[in-house]
Amino acid sequence: MSLDIVILAAGQGTRMRSALPKVLHPVANKPMLGHVIDTARSLQPQSIQVVIGHGADTVRERLAADDLNFVIQAEQLGTGHAVAQALPQLSAERVLILYGDVPLIETATLQRLLALVSDDQLGLLTVELADPTGYGRIVRDDSGVVQAIVEHKDASDAQRQIREGNTGILAVPGKRLADWLGRLSNSNAQGEYYLTDVIAMAVADGLTVATERAADEMEVLGANDRIQLAQLECHYQQRMARRLMAQGVTLRDPHRFDVRGQVSVGRDVTIDINVILEGKVVIEDDVQIGPNCVIKDSVLRKGAIVKANSHLDGAEMGEGADCGPFARLRPGSKLGAKAHVGNFVELKNAVMGEGAKAGHLSYLGDAEIGARSNIGAGTITCNYDGANKFRTVMGEDVFIGSNSALVAPVMLGDRATTGAGSVVTSDVPADTLAVGRAKQRNIEGWKRPTKK
């Protein structure tokens, strides 16, 4: 059966106390609405309608995509009114209504919900709540059949004792929706057009209201303030930690680990505390990541080791390579197999060949370093002249003496050597020693200045 999805994202979110529209507040570095859109896409609908209102231009600009249609709700008159704004765009056999501030809803849950929908049956997602305050209550008859949803403010004392709450997520037969929305009334405590009133209409029209239960409260929690936003973040991170551990990853402490993107992992990976994985990260078998590391949009090949307090962004580490502690690999950096980058070494758009080493205290930018070459402490590639960047190219088995400055553009042939403290401004042929420093002069009988 064909499917249209409507995502309600027009709310202001005053309790966030923020100029940013509520649905753009992030969970795991992605807007809450972005998570919901990703889940919607996984269901392969024929259209996704996003109903926006408060901060509409900002929301549209942030999340615009070819497969999204944004619909304006000029006045926030309730959830039923919001869905009605999208009606002209809906033509599928089934319509699923989601919420832009409920980012943890799972694809599998929604698939089960959609399986309930037929011409004479709709699907309602409910949840068992420890404290249902504020939630609409699911009212059933003596045989357990759903009769209506009663909003908290309109509920009687007896109805407020019900712990089964409405999540707001609803899947309905598309051909029925326009009729139901057209019959909504705002005669209630809020003076709004409640989407939940559709349930009583469906029952009156002879349809069955089938229910699917969410796994837990967190899956359907919406973020109305920053406290709930933090709860969502914590739950998301624990969910990701469990998934990675199930795939063969050892997390030293799952409560001190963050995923903020897409992560692919191999087996027997070990990750220490306070590690952040951002963007698209690929981690192969037997990789070890030390504490306090940030790894973004990077690839770690089999057996790579990232030592404590290192930062990788857009980098690739070859099989058996290692870096750190306190290493920084910036975009375009690539370490060959068994290459070594030590403490306080920064690479930017630099490629190190197999077995090459830069042990400590160096900046290597816009550079190509051949296999087995050794970079002495304090080496700098001087790649910027104030207007343009230039490359430094080293062959294989090159030895760079400590505290050398390589002024690009410059090339060093295979097995070239530079003396410690040299400033290299021209190419060095293969098998050649380059020494570029002032001759030492000793002054005998030198007396240090004294204070006056």
From Swiss-Prot:
Q: Which cofactor does it need?
A: Mg(2+)
Its EC number(s): 2.7.7.23, 2.3.1.157
Provide the reaction this enzyme catalyses.
alpha-D-glucosamine 1-phosphate + acetyl-CoA = N-acetyl-alpha-D-glucosamine 1-phosphate + CoA + H(+); N-acetyl-alpha-D-glucosamine 1-phosphate + UTP + H(+) = UDP-N-acetyl-alpha-D-glucosamine + diphosphate
Which pathway does UniProt place it in? Answer: Nucleotide-sugar biosynthesis; UDP-N-acetyl-alpha-D-glucosamine biosynthesis; N-acetyl-alpha-D-glucosamine 1-phosphate from alpha-D-glucosamine 6-phosphate (route II): step 2/2; Nucleotide-sugar biosynthesis; UDP-N-acetyl-alpha-D-glucosamine biosynthesis; UDP-N-acetyl-alpha-D-glucosamine from N-acetyl-alpha-D-glucosamine 1-phosphate: step 1/1; Bacterial outer membrane biogenesis; LPS lipid A biosynthesis
State one Pfam family annotation.
Answer: NTP_transf_3
Cross-referenced InterPro entries: Bifunctional_GlmU, GlmU-like, GlmU_C_LbH, Hexapep, MobA-like_NTP_Trfase, Nucleotide-diphossugar_trans, Trimer_LpxA-like_sf
Instruction: Locate the residues binding Mg(2+).
Output: D101, N224
The entry's UDP-N-acetyl-alpha-D-glucosamine-binding residues are 8-11, 22, 73, 78-79, 99-101, 136, 151, 166, 224, 330, 348, 363, 374
What is known about what this protein does? Answer: Catalyzes the last two sequential reactions in the de novo biosynthetic pathway for UDP-N-acetylglucosamine (UDP-GlcNAc). The C-terminal domain catalyzes the transfer of acetyl group from acetyl coenzyme A to glucosamine-1-phosphate (GlcN-1-P) to produce N-acetylglucosamine-1-phosphate (GlcNAc-1-P), which is converted into UDP-GlcNAc by the transfer of uridine 5-monophosphate (from uridine 5-triphosphate), a reaction catalyzed by the N-terminal domain.
Q: Which PANTHER family match?
A: BIFUNCTIONAL PROTEIN GLMU (PTHR43584:SF3), NUCLEOTIDYL TRANSFERASE (PTHR43584)
Q: What is this protein called?
A: Bifunctional protein GlmU
Q: Which organism is it from?
A: Ectopseudomonas mendocina (strain ymp)
Q: Which gene encodes it?
A: glmU
